[in-house]
Amino acid sequence: MASRFPKFSQGLSQDPTTRRIWFGIATAHDFESHDNITEERLYQKIFASHFGQLAIIFLWTSGNLFHVAWQGNFEAWVQDPLHVRPIAHAIWDPHFGEPAVEAFTRGGALGPVNIAYSGVYQWWYTIGLRTIQDLYIGALFLLFLAAVFLIAGWLHLQPKWKPSVSWFKNAESRLNHHLSGLFGVSSLAWAGHLIHVAIPESRGEHVRWDNLLTALPHPQGLKPFFEGQWGIYAENADSSSHLFSTSQGAGTAILTFIGGFHPQTQSLWLTDIAHHHLAIAVVFIIAGHMYRTNFGIGHSIKEILETHTPPGGRLGRGHKGLYDTINNSLHFQLGLALASTGVITSLVAQHMYSLPSYAYIAQDFTTQAALYTHHQYIAGFIMTGAFAHGAIFFIRDYNPEQNKDNVLARMLEHKEAIISHLSWASLFLGFHTLGLYVHNDVMLAFGTPEKQILIEPVFAQWIQSAHGKTLYGFDLLLSSADSPAFNAGQSIWLPGWLDAINNNSNSLFLTIGPGDFLVHHAIALGLHTTTLILVKGALDARGSKLMPDKKEFGYSFPCDGPGRGGTCDISAWDAFYLAVFWMLNTIGWVTFYWHWKHITLWQGNVAQFNESSTYLMGWLRDYLWLNSSQLINGYNPFGMNSLSVWAWMFLFGHLVWATGFMFLISWRGYWQELIETLTWAHERTPLANLVRWRDKPVALSIVQARLVGLTHFSVGYIFTYAAFLIASTSGKFG
């Protein structure tokens, strides 16, 4: 008999019901649970899959370059970045009638096209690409890289090239290589590209392979470097009247510390960016020589951790036992990696708009909104994943003997205190914030807006002032003309910073008031509640007073039958599942806030946000309803417009979202009865009953249905908001 899916589980492949298919898909990537898995094969499979992942990323980015080169308008956009709309790719759709073809033929194209809201045009322009040929060369190079990585992945699965477990567990060597090689050398290479290609291009000098070795990035070459006169590289920076991509007003500096933004492009100075990457490179290349490997010099991570015992003994045995615990647990390592990547992704969202590094991207409002929202949602999923794998670590990999009285054991021992404090913070934030919003709502409804409770965010304003924002009248640090920091800043470092922070046309340190204070606390409520659910899920994953033997049931179980009185909904997976809803809603509030604040800033009517954001009806009426009205009107009796695709996606997103509830609200028995009825009907219907099934149809398990419901909820939620965001922004600003 031919082997059936899934090959990795003999038991499951013999299941006579449709559970075989769904459970097979669900456990396909849980390598640890597969038949005949050894630690060595586990590590090798994961290692090989990393090469596949990188190949997919390179193929995808190659596709972006290729489609823009083939169907885009890059060269036309380069001539006039502020007025030509960048084209992502053409649309071929046989359903398009004349009105649709007309509506979607934009950006100087000959037929229907999609506009690019990803910022790739601005990115490629900033790093020195100027022609379609440049894009094609980039696409081919990335395609070649993808092939190299696929071959490397295959190679590392061959017996001769398979790394051993000891190689995977050599933490010091890996850290050295990742710090020096991955971060350090790649940052150095990027600084090199900026200095040799991007900065000359921004000054109208075209550097390509034919003149790379003959075009000097700086008139004095390497002489100042070897003489230690490094300051020469910062002299004669681009002037404030510099026209980007031309020599007019251009300087010769390559490494500067100007601060603020280029007046024309509204983006960070390229010479500042090159300086930043060079500094990062130096720091990380040094950091990558810190850990002890074959040469007997440098730090041993294990020794550092073992030595970390808190003074006075009040905090137990500190980090003792952590080295082996982390080094032997892939889930712990993945949890740490996801936690840091999640934070970094959220920081990227924050910095891409407040300190834009790509030329003209700050004036492309729809792209700014799309990139912020995209990175915040990605960050949310990655961060919840960190806690999920933290919980799996506690269930599968945590060994109480190895971690006696260290920080991990102590976290578990006083989990009640941690969870109850988080609970208190969430309750406090929720009741007070909602109380203020509802009070203000009632005052507006009764026609007495002056009775609203409006709280100025004085601490946040004080922090903004310390950084140089003079508007609030706090006279301190960088906002005080008498402070040493202010005086030093004029000449030595960041002279452009103070101009930028006090200029109302950018998004650096936005002016804040009572509306910001309220929504800030609403977001804090969401963050704390999400964290509460996730932390509780991980800390209770091994067991709780209610269910001390929980870890024996694994990561995801529905219940332990009716006999134990309430063991449903308490698996670590359930905590993750509930937290994702809170995460999505929290990021909803974050993106609503960001988008409304910026729409009013870009339209020049900040008063609308300031006045309407202090009560709930303001948010519902003046943000959601007002900005979705165009969307709902994408199709009408008078034809269609270029927003109609977003109108359709807005409707479709709601549909997908609502479908989620079908899986979330009704339980398994209902579906099992329905399936049995349909099966009965099928078997008794002529012609239909000629078609038989190999697997007996059964309903999804409770956990599987929750996953399907959660996926529909998440996808629908994001589709709906994406359509709303892009249509409402592009409808206003083009």
UniProtKB/Swiss-Prot annotation:
<protein>
    <recommendedName>
        <fullName>Photosystem I P700 chlorophyll a apoprotein A2</fullName>
        <ecNumber>1.97.1.12</ecNumber>
    </recommendedName>
</protein>
<feature type="transmembrane region" description="Helical; Name=I">
    <location>
        <begin position="46"/>
        <end position="69"/>
    </location>
</feature>
<keyword id="KW-0472">Membrane</keyword>
<keyword id="KW-0249">Electron transport</keyword>
<keyword id="KW-0479">Metal-binding</keyword>
<comment type="function">
    <text>PsaA and PsaB bind P700, the primary electron donor of photosystem I (PSI), as well as the electron acceptors A0, A1 and FX. PSI is a plastocyanin-ferredoxin oxidoreductase, converting photonic excitation into a charge separation, which transfers an electron from the donor P700 chlorophyll pair to the spectroscopically characterized acceptors A0, A1, FX, FA and FB in turn. Oxidized P700 is reduced on the lumenal side of the thylakoid membrane by plastocyanin.</text>
</comment>
<keyword id="KW-0603">Photosystem I</keyword>
<dbReference type="InterPro" id="IPR006244">
    <property type="entry name" value="PSI_PsaB"/>
</dbReference>
<keyword id="KW-0408">Iron</keyword>
<feature type="transmembrane region" description="Helical; Name=II">
    <location>
        <begin position="135"/>
        <end position="158"/>
    </location>
</feature>
<feature type="binding site">
    <location>
        <position position="671"/>
    </location>
    <ligand>
        <name>phylloquinone</name>
    </ligand>
</feature>
<dbReference type="GO" id="GO:0009522">
    <property type="term" value="C:photosystem I"/>
</dbReference>
<feature type="binding site" description="axial binding residue">
    <location>
        <position position="662"/>
    </location>
    <ligand>
        <name>chlorophyll a B3</name>
    </ligand>
</feature>
<feature type="transmembrane region" description="Helical; Name=X">
    <location>
        <begin position="643"/>
        <end position="665"/>
    </location>
</feature>
<keyword id="KW-0004">4Fe-4S</keyword>
<dbReference type="GO" id="GO:0051539">
    <property type="term" value="F:4 iron, 4 sulfur cluster binding"/>
</dbReference>
<feature type="transmembrane region" description="Helical; Name=IX">
    <location>
        <begin position="575"/>
        <end position="596"/>
    </location>
</feature>
<comment type="similarity">
    <text>Belongs to the PsaA/PsaB family.</text>
</comment>
<keyword id="KW-0812">Transmembrane</keyword>
<keyword id="KW-0934">Plastid</keyword>
<feature type="transmembrane region" description="Helical; Name=V">
    <location>
        <begin position="330"/>
        <end position="353"/>
    </location>
</feature>
<feature type="binding site" description="axial binding residue">
    <location>
        <position position="654"/>
    </location>
    <ligand>
        <name>chlorophyll a B1</name>
    </ligand>
</feature>
<keyword id="KW-0460">Magnesium</keyword>
<feature type="binding site">
    <location>
        <position position="559"/>
    </location>
    <ligand>
        <name>[4Fe-4S] cluster</name>
    </ligand>
</feature>
<keyword id="KW-0602">Photosynthesis</keyword>
<keyword id="KW-0411">Iron-sulfur</keyword>
<feature type="transmembrane region" description="Helical; Name=XI">
    <location>
        <begin position="707"/>
        <end position="727"/>
    </location>
</feature>
<keyword id="KW-0157">Chromophore</keyword>
<dbReference type="GO" id="GO:0009055">
    <property type="term" value="F:electron transfer activity"/>
</dbReference>
<feature type="transmembrane region" description="Helical; Name=VII">
    <location>
        <begin position="417"/>
        <end position="439"/>
    </location>
</feature>
<dbReference type="GO" id="GO:0015979">
    <property type="term" value="P:photosynthesis"/>
</dbReference>
<keyword id="KW-0793">Thylakoid</keyword>
<dbReference type="Pfam" id="PF00223">
    <property type="entry name" value="PsaA_PsaB"/>
</dbReference>
<keyword id="KW-0148">Chlorophyll</keyword>
<keyword id="KW-0150">Chloroplast</keyword>
<dbReference type="InterPro" id="IPR001280">
    <property type="entry name" value="PSI_PsaA/B"/>
</dbReference>
<dbReference type="InterPro" id="IPR020586">
    <property type="entry name" value="PSI_PsaA/B_CS"/>
</dbReference>
<dbReference type="GO" id="GO:0016168">
    <property type="term" value="F:chlorophyll binding"/>
</dbReference>
<dbReference type="InterPro" id="IPR036408">
    <property type="entry name" value="PSI_PsaA/B_sf"/>
</dbReference>
<keyword id="KW-0560">Oxidoreductase</keyword>
<feature type="transmembrane region" description="Helical; Name=III">
    <location>
        <begin position="175"/>
        <end position="199"/>
    </location>
</feature>
<feature type="transmembrane region" description="Helical; Name=IV">
    <location>
        <begin position="273"/>
        <end position="291"/>
    </location>
</feature>
